[in-house]
Amino acid sequence: MSDWTEAYRPTTLSEVRGNNKARDAFEEWAKAWEDHREAVILHGSPGVGKTSAAHALANDMGWPVLEMNASDARTKDEIERFAGRAASNATLGGGRQLIILDEADNLHQHKDRGGAAAMTRLVKDATQPVVLIANDYYEMSSGLRSACRDVEFRDVSARSIVPVLRDICRQENVEFDEDVLQEIAEANRGDLRGAVKDLQARERDGEIKPEGSEGSRDRTEDIFAFLDAVLKEESAEEALQTAYAVDETPDNLLQWIEDKVPKVYEGDELADAYEHLADADVWLGRVRATQNYSYWRYATDNVAAGVAAVRQEDRGGWTRYGGAPYRSSRDSTRDYIATRIAESAGVSTATARREILPYLSAMTHHCNNRELTVRMTARYELDAEHVAFITGSGKTTNKVQGIVEDAETRRETAAVDHGGGIFAPAVDDAQSDTESDDDDDGDTLAAFGADEPKEESVNREQSDGTADAEESDDGQAGLSDFM
């Protein structure tokens, strides 16, 4: 079953409901852009259609979209790099493209340091139409606000929401009661996206069920019910239904599951779960690259159904999940690790994050393979926070602190002894260690120092049919180091 919020996302501005005045002002801004060349801020509550309107406008105008969203690091350097890419694309294509900067009011986090000033420069210097999207207009800097026009999207009235829900029911061929649609519209208080999610959550056996029936969306506890459903209780199909009932986007669901799965899964379950999360991340990357939001459904399939399907047994009891994932520190930590892996393996940062990091997490889970964890820490120059992120162990624990100290000693020794380099001693040790272990352990240890390629890697390159396969970034580069 597809996500109705994506299946029925407006494709033209004429389909944007409940904000006719804002829609018309936005369209007027676009058509007159050659004359004024100013950026515009679309602001208003979540779920009122700001992002949908931006993409619908791009379709109407025939403009390709280049988007920077909240999941991207938005430091000064990243925004300047993004601006350079936008300018480059415009030069190559020769036409207009729409630049979308999502959550422009959320640049106060540590990882976005310098981002507000860089974004202000971007909108002032842009040679392409720029749309900034914000929930809270006054959370943005005064300099950024003064550099842009603004269009306010107001909360969508229940009177405007009901026809949307009715149209979806007819398209999906499900029975409905007008009173139930009115109830859903009023309960969501201007949030059209939330109303559509509620509608889908209440659909059972070709009928929209009334409040209190099975499937009604709980807006206060739904994220933790979702975690329990995926990680502990429900089948793959049931977990997917729960995912559709949660008022969160697939990228946010991915962050929640990725952050909490080590609290419940372990061993093969955890490794298999990371496989599905990596696949979900690939689909989300395609959404960012193509702006085709129909791919969201495949990301959700992996995050919910995929992770639930690899669970070997149901679990009861209460789990201390903790609060929401801390995006600023968590993402900056992951970005650093992915960058170090990418530099070492000769792959892109995206490939390192999607394809390699999940394997590292599985192989070094809770530092069970201490030698491998030390070797990894030394190779990628990681500190306690990075080791804790990868292994799931606390950064202040004795084992993590000991691993970091041993890795530092290994780096210092290698700096003095230039004969074999930093990893040669580790490989020599590994050869003696693996005499009594199976071949898989030998291959795993080789990831952190072997100079001679494994037979698997050679065979993989031959099967690819290209001599420079390892230099290409096809989404699989670097995996042979860990197989």
Swiss-Prot record:
Recorded hits in SUPFAM superfamilies, A to Z, give:
P-loop containing nucleoside triphosphate hydrolases (SSF52540)
Q: Give residue spans, biased composition: Acidic residues.
A: 430-443
**Keyword annotations of the record:** ATP-binding, DNA replication, Nucleotide-binding
Q: Residues that bind ATP, according to the entry? A: G44, S45, P46, G47, V48, G49, K50, T51
List this protein's GO terms for biological process: DNA replication
Q: Which Pfam families match?
A: AAA (PF00004), RCF1-5-like_lid (PF21960)
Transmembrane parts of this sequence: none
SMART domains hit by this protein: AAA
Q: Describe its function.
A: Part of the RFC clamp loader complex which loads the PCNA sliding clamp onto DNA.
Checking NCBIfam families in the record gives:
PRK04195.1-4, PRK04195.1-5
Give the family per the record.
Belongs to the activator 1 small subunits family. RfcL subfamily.
What is the protein named?
A: Replication factor C large subunit
